[in-house]
């Protein structure tokens, strides 16, 4: 078997940049890492509770965290920020208070900014949420994968590969099904590839969804 590496980590420094930007002493590193995880979990939980969508898509593509001595800057890249802001003008303020409570940060300022992604379905995280929603509502996996590919075609992508693993359609034996459209050159480091692994809980058990999207070469 070929040894598979995470396409994002493989391309760090060429086409991919870090989602967390901060420095710390080695003894405080673990603490900083846990803090990042807390911020991300807190934001995801808040968005999950406060956005109601028919397709089950929360629309968070990624959360970037930049830390300085007295400031934590959080940038949330969302596909559909309207869902969070539209019906609640205080949405971002509430989120900020929630995160501050979770972190217990007294002497540091917290800034949260939300930016919109131009083509939401060109992002694997949002696409995985869409497929997960379809699988939960018992749509056949092939139909869900084809619909996802149709959505990415509107987002001007060069290629996509989707893989679903587990007890598909409630079958006794777990298996892996995958579909590819266009080119997905995983070995080319200069190829800009976005990747996501997502788990979805269905009534039959847990399914794993992996998505690779090829955006073009740099």
Curated annotation (Swiss-Prot):
Q: What is this protein called?
A: Small ribosomal subunit protein uS3c
Q: Which PANTHER family match?
A: 30S/40S RIBOSOMAL PROTEIN S3, SMALL RIBOSOMAL SUBUNIT PROTEIN US3C
Task: Offer one Pfam family short name for this entry.
Answer: Ribosomal_S3_C
Residue ranges occupied by any KH type-2 domain in the UniProt entry: 47-118
Family the entry assigns: Belongs to the universal ribosomal protein uS3 family.
Provide GO CC annotations from the record. Answer: chloroplast; cytosolic small ribosomal subunit
Q: Name one GO biological process term.
A: translation
- Coarse class of the primary localization is plastid
How this chain assembles, per its entry, is: Component of the chloroplast small ribosomal subunit (SSU). Mature 70S chloroplast ribosomes of higher plants consist of a small (30S) and a large (50S) subunit. The 30S small subunit contains 1 molecule of ribosomal RNA (16S rRNA) and 24 different proteins. The 50S large subunit contains 3 rRNA molecules (23S, 5S and 4.5S rRNA) and 33 different proteins.
**Molecular function in Gene Ontology:** rRNA binding; structural constituent of ribosome
């Amino acid at each position: 078997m070929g040894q598979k590496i995470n396409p994002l980590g493989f391309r760090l420094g060429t086409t991919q940049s870090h989602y967390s930007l901060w420095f710390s002493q080695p003894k405080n590193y673990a603490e900083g890492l846990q803090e990042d995880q807390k911020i991300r979990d807190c934001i995801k939980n808040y968005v999950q509770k406060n956005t109601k969508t028919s397709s089950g898509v929360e629309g968070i593509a990624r959360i970037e965290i930049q830390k300085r001595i007295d400031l934590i800057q959080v940038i949330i890249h969302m596909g559909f920020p309207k869902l969070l802001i539209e019906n609640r003008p205080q949405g971002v303020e509430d989120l900020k208070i929630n995160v501050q409570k979770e972190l217990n940060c007294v002497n540091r300022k917290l800034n949260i900014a939300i930016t919109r992604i131009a083509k939401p379905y060109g992002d694997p995280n949002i696409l995985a949420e869409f497929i997960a929603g379809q699988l939960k509502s018992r749509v056949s996996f092939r139909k869900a994968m084809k619909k996802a590919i149709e959505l990415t075609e509107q987002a001007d992508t060069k290629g996509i590969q989707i893989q679903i693993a587990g007890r598909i359609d409630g079958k006794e034996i777990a298996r892996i099904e995958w579909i590819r459209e266009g080119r997905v050159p995983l070995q080319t480091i200069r190829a800009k590839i976005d990747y996501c692994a997502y788990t979805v809980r269905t009534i039959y058990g847990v399914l794993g969804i992996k998505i690779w999207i090829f955006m073009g070469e740099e």
